[in-house]
Amino acid sequence: MQTAYFSGGCFWCVEAIFQRIVGIIKLTSGYCNGNTSNPTYQDICLGVTGHAEVVKIEFDEFKISFKVLLDIFFEIHNPTTLNQQGNDRGTQYRSAIFYINNKQQLQAINMINLMSDNIVTQVTKLDCFYPAEDYHQNYFNNNLSKPYCQMLIRPKLDKYFSQ
């Protein structure tokens, strides 16, 4: 089993798509690489802790590669907007790949180098990860009728999986 950490805006959207990908074993929404220990969602929303909203992806490398995960990651968010995805604004929503080894770092950098010059995605060593509160886990599946899920997450799922 391997692990990847991606920040591409609100973790609810990122989680919802990766939940539907073959080879994914477990997903955990959380916060990483900030300047405080054990942050809460309220802390993150203030935008002063330095943490990013991330999804920790545990995957079977025999069924899906890190490179394929990178391909999906870059398809499901806008890597050219600094600290913003749609209406979500702030450093917690930055586009970032938090690598755990040199191979992941090199694959991420190589992929970005093949893309346009406008990519703002950070490639940063993972320093720390804190799981988000329980109500953030499996958010879309647990809250299908909520307006955010219907207006933002559902269309992203439909768009990605209709390709």
Curated annotation (Swiss-Prot):
Keyword Oxidoreductase in record: yes
Name of the protein this chain belongs to: Peptide methionine sulfoxide reductase MsrA
Matching NCBIfam families: msrA (TIGR00401)
Which key words tag this protein in UniProt?
A: Oxidoreductase
Q: Which gene encodes it?
A: msrA
Q: What are the EC numbers?
A: 1.8.4.11
Catalyzed reactions: L-methionyl-[protein] + [thioredoxin]-disulfide + H2O = L-methionyl-(S)-S-oxide-[protein] + [thioredoxin]-dithiol; [thioredoxin]-disulfide + L-methionine + H2O = L-methionine (S)-S-oxide + [thioredoxin]-dithiol
Name a GO molecular-function annotation.
peptide-methionine (S)-S-oxide reductase activity
The record's section on HAMAP family has: MsrA
Which source organism?
Vesicomyosocius okutanii subsp. Calyptogena okutanii (strain HA)
Against InterPro entries, the record matches this protein to: Met_Sox_Rdtase_MsrA_dom (IPR002569), Met_Sox_Rdtase_MsrA_sf (IPR036509)
Family affiliation: Belongs to the MsrA Met sulfoxide reductase family.
Described by its record, this protein's role is as follows: Has an important function as a repair enzyme for proteins that have been inactivated by oxidation. Catalyzes the reversible oxidation-reduction of methionine sulfoxide in proteins to methionine.
Sorted alphabetically, the Gene Ontology BP terms of this entry are: protein modification process
Q: Which PANTHER family match?
A: PEPTIDE METHIONINE SULFOXIDE REDUCTASE, PEPTIDE METHIONINE SULFOXIDE REDUCTASE MSRA 2
The active site consists of 10
